[in-house]
């Protein structure tokens, strides 16, 4: 079942329960759900992130899957004067923290010329929406790209996003929830998405109208 369909079913359930309570309490004899009353019943619409307007070094757009469907997320990285400590915030689970450590090790090996930056500064990795728990390995490629952007000082284009687990040797491994993630990317204004090569078969489950609006590049 797609994330969009799941969301519709959840909202229908809320409407039915709302109507049942009103009828049982005798507050109303019948209930008509009009377009104007939807906000009264369901509240305001869900807020979805949009791509960055002004990209900066160290910040890259990733893709996540949640129980509510796909979402984009931003990986933010920065250096501050220090002695090499690593600070990770944003309510990340153990698996995602391990992905961050793998990304750090990989970037150090890819850019030995910037080794002093890691020694002479503290590294802060943050994933916004700190009240929302985040976990899983699929942000690996995004973490590597964000750290690469930080050490080189080159911002990643705002219209790109990515998803994929990364190994210590730099390989990109498959992830789950690709249809939902691509739907979220297209909704947010992303134009170009990098996905694991091993997930190419999953594109058969992605709606044509989503694929038509995205340039999708497989990586290994």
Over which residues does each language-model region extend?
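Peripheral, non-AAA+ core regions of ATP-driven protein-machinery
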Residues: 26-61, 68-220
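Conserved P-loop NTPase
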Residues: 3, 13, 74-77
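Short, small-residue-biased leader/transition segments that mark boundaries at the very start
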Residues: 1-9
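C-terminal helical "lid" of AAA+/P-loop NTPase domains
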Residues: 10-21
């Amino acid at each position: 079942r797609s994330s969009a369909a799941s969301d519709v079913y959840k909202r229908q359930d809320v409407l039915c329960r709302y109507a049942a309570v009103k009828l049982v309490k005798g507050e109303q004899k019948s209930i008509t759900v009009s377009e104007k009353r939807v906000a009264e019943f369901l509240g305001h619409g869900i807020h979805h992130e949009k791509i960055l307007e002004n990209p900066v070094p160290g910040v890259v757009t990733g893709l996540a899957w949640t129980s509510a469907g796909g979402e984009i997320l931003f990986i933010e990285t920065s250096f501050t004067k220090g002695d090499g400590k690593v600070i990770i915030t944003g309510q990340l689970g153990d698996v995602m923290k391990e992905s961050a450590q793998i990304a750090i090790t990989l970037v150090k090996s890819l850019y030995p010329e910037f080794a002093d930056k890691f020694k002479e500064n503290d590294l802060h990795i943050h994933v916004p929406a700190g009240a929302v728990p985040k976990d899983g390995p699929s942000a690996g490629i995004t973490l590597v790209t964000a750290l690469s952007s930080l050490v080189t000082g080159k911002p990643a284009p705002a219209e790109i996003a990515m998803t994929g687990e990364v190994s210590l040797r730099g390989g990109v491994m498959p992830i789950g929830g690709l249809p939902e993630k691509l739907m979220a990317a297209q909704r947010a204004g992303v134009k170009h998405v990098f996905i694991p090569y091993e997930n190419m078969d999953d594109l058969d489950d992605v709606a044509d109208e989503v694929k038509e609006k995205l340039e999708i590049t497989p990586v290994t």
